Amino acid sequence: LDENAIAARKAAWEDVLTIHSCEMYPPDEAWDAIYDAIEEGRQPPWPETHLHLEPQDTSLPGWLALLELIEDAARDRRETFSPKEILGAELWGQVITLPPSIAKLKHVKKLNLYRSSLLRIPPEIGEMESLEQFVPYTSYGLHWFPYEITRCRHLKSSTVSTRALYGNYKYRPTFPELDPVVEALIPARCSVCDRLLESRGEVHQRWLSLNVATDILPLLVNACSIECVEQLPAPAQGYVPFPHKGGTSVVQPPAD
């Protein structure tokens, strides 16, 4: 790459790195090899990626304020939920995952998570039955989403930072390994049939890239059985063509 291309690349990532840093955003020397591979139609030499499993500090004022805000929004039957606008950047920046209580937001049509520090979205988002618009744009720590988001039947619009996503078509970064099972991300119920997961040993975790609203999202599936894995829909065209366990051995289609 010439000097102008390198400068443009640095500028493009400057905003990202002020918010979030991990293997998804490697140093410049790694990008040289990644771009060379993309141009030659080869599998980019991405490093192994790891899921963000940092726990939420539930003693922080930002977390406590968010819990109250969710209760208020549920009680008032609000149709737009934009926590940063109410909490402010400092308090909102203390939140790295949404609480399960977002399931109470039955009337919310627009969920605005713009420029957050979020690392995870809980599976309870699937219970937001009125959700139509999902905006996690510039939330660069959100590399994947729970399969349960596909239960939001009215969801028709999304604005996601594509370059932050595992397996995205631009760069094809590696999916984290799901073997062994990542116990910290196992929900109470099967992602597919909603059966209670009585034993963590029975869970089958898979990655699946699907069309969700106006984006193709990498989704984490927690299935109770192989039968439920087999019931999953076909992945989006141009992505890994089957549910998989991630890792550097998974061959992805060439980057665009």
Where are these regions (language model features)?
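Per-repeat beta-strand-to-loop junction in leucine-rich repeat
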Residues: 91, 114-115, 124, 137-138, ...
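Short amphipathic alpha-helical patches
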Residues: 126, 137, 145-149, 172-173, ...
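Extracellular beta-strand scaffolds
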Residues: 119, 141-142
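The feature encodes a structural signal of leucine-rich repeats
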Residues: 98-100, 121-124, 145-147, 169-171
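The feature captures the LRR N-terminal capping module
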Residues: 1-104, 140, 154-256
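Leucine-rich repeat
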Residues: 104-107, 127-131, 139, 148-155
